[in-house]
Amino acid sequence: EQCGDDVCGAGHCCSEYPPMHCKRVGQLYDLCMASKATKNSGNHLFFCPCDEGMYCDMNSWSCQKRTA
């Protein structure tokens, strides 16, 4: 799926969902960014969990290794 300027795939940590999806998932709502954080799609960015020891780099929209 398109996410920001990138496509959500292997190693990536975000994808776009409509605002109603964010509301439906309830407890995951806090993982959905405000719609203004996306392009002009009106969708919210939803951040998938990264592997252990990784974090989501919102600049590159990818999972990066944590540095000590």
From Swiss-Prot:
Any Pfam family hit: MIT_LIKE_ACTX
Residues that span the membrane, as ranges: none
UniProt key word DNA-binding: no
Sequence similarity: Belongs to the MIT-like AcTx family.
Disulphide-bonded residues: C3-C14, C8-C22, C13-C48, C32-C56, C50-C63
Highest taxon of source: Eukaryota
Single GO cellular component term: extracellular region
Compartments it resides in: Secreted
Coiled coil: none
Tissue: Expressed by the venom gland.
Miscellaneous information on this protein: Negative results: is not toxic to insects or mammals. Has no effect on smooth muscle contractility. Also lacks both agonist and antagonist activity at human prokineticin receptor 1 and 2 (PROKR1 and PROKR2). May not be involved in prey digestion.
InterPro entries the record matches: Atracotoxin
UniProt name for this protein: U1-hexatoxin-Hv1a
Keywords: Disulfide bond, Secreted
